[in-house]
């Protein structure tokens, strides 16, 4: 379940694309881990966009800083864009986040949680 929220702006890339963009499932297949380990896709767009920092709380929720602005004013800083802090939760404990809540969407030049 995704909480209703204002539509997020499209990401703005300040650099030329040097590698092809992969879908989350394709990127997951490209990850190599040691024998006995596995990786699992827990969240992807549109549930989370432009993540720059994450932190777990005591309840097992993942707090994510989404950055739509940039810390350097010279690099595409738009006053109308706002950064967000969202909370992702795995309510059925299957390892995949199924609940998203916007905690704060009024940040500007956010750099961490």
Residue ranges: model-predicted function:
Residues 2-113:
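Beta-propeller domains with acidic blade repeats across secreted/periplasmic ectodomains
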């Amino acid at each position: 379940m995704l909480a209703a929220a204002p539509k997020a702006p499209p990401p703005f890339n300040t650099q030329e694309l040097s590698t092809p963009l992969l879908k989350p499932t394709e990127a997951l297949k490209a990850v190599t881990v040691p024998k006995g380990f596995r990786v699992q896709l827990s969240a992807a767009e549109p549930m989370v966009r432009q993540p720059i920092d994450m932190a777990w709380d005591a309840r097992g929720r993942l707090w994510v800083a989404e950055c739509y602005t940039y810390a350097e004013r010279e690099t595409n800083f738009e006053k109308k864009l706002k950064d967000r802090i969202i909370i992702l939760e795995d309510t059925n404990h299957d390892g995949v986040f199924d609940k998203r809540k916007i905690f704060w969407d009024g940040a500007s030049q956010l750099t961490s949680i």
